[in-house]
Amino acid sequence: IEVLPLDFRKKLKDDGFKVSELIIKERNLANDGTLKLLLSTDDNESIECVGIPTEKRLTACLSSQVGCPMDCKFCATGKEGLKRSLKASEILDQILFIENEMNRKVTNIVFMGMGEPLLNIDDLLLSIRSINNDFQISQRKITVSTVAVPKMISKLSAKSFQILGNCQFTLAISLHASNQKTRETIIPSAKNYEIKNIIEDCKKFVRETGRRVSFEYLMLSGVNDKLEHAYELSNL
C-alpha cells in the first residue's frame, strides 16, 4: 500500500496483516492509454509491469523475475542479468497495482515482462492458480511467453497438471529467427536448445495439454527480415 508510511507498513506486517511488498516508483502513461509502472520491491530491486487497455479488455503484462539471465540482444532487461525470481505474491501485486491505477479490472494476462517465466516455474504456476481462482480470470486468457529453456516445456506441462489440475493457458515461444545460426546471434541461450528440439517439445506439449502453441517473431532490420527468412520460417 503505497500511501502508508514504511514504519506503519512494517507494524502491520508484524501484526500479521498482509500488506503489498511493492511500491510505485514511477508511472508512465502513453497517449493510447497504456500505463507502465516501475515498482520497487521490499529489498529495493526494481521491476516493471504494463497495463494495456482497449475498449473491451485490459491486458496486464507481468514480470516474473528481477532482471533476466537469458541476455537476448534485443531486450534491455537481459543486460542487467538475473537478480532473483519473484514470489507469487509479488507477481499478483502487479495486477492489483494496474487495476488500482487504471480503475478497472484486468481481463487478460501476458507473462511478457522482465524475466524468463519458465525459470520461475513454481511461483509462475502458483500465481496463475490465484489469477484463475481469486481474480476470476480464465486460464484461456493467460499467455506465458518463453525464449525456451531445455527440458522446461515438458516440465511446464507436468507441473501445470500438478499445481493447476489442468493446462489451459497459451504457451508462446519467442522464436525470433528462422534458423539456428541467426537465433544464436540474438538469443545466446539458444546454443543449448536447437530450434528442431523446441519444435518437438512443443508438439509434445500440444499432445499432453490439447492447447495450441504460439510463436513470436520480432523482425530486426538486416537480421531476420529477408524473404529467405520467411521461406525458412514456413518450413519449420
Where are these regions (language model features)?
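Conserved alpha-helical substructure of the radical SAM core
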Residues: K79-N108
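Short aromatic/hydrophobic contact patches that present stacked aromatics
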Residues: K36, T59-S63, T143, E216
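Conserved AdoMet/S-adenosylmethionine-binding subsite of the radical SAM
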Residues: E99-N100, R104-N108, G113-L236
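Short, small-residue-rich loop/turn micro-motifs
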Residues: T41, V66-C68, L175-A177
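Flexible, acidic/Gly-rich N-terminal and inter-domain linker regions that tether
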Residues: I1-L58
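Canonical Radical SAM [4Fe-4S] cluster-binding loop centered on the CxxxCxxC motif
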Residues: P53-E90
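Short linear Ser/Thr-Pro motifs
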Residues: L29-A30, S63-S64, S145, S174
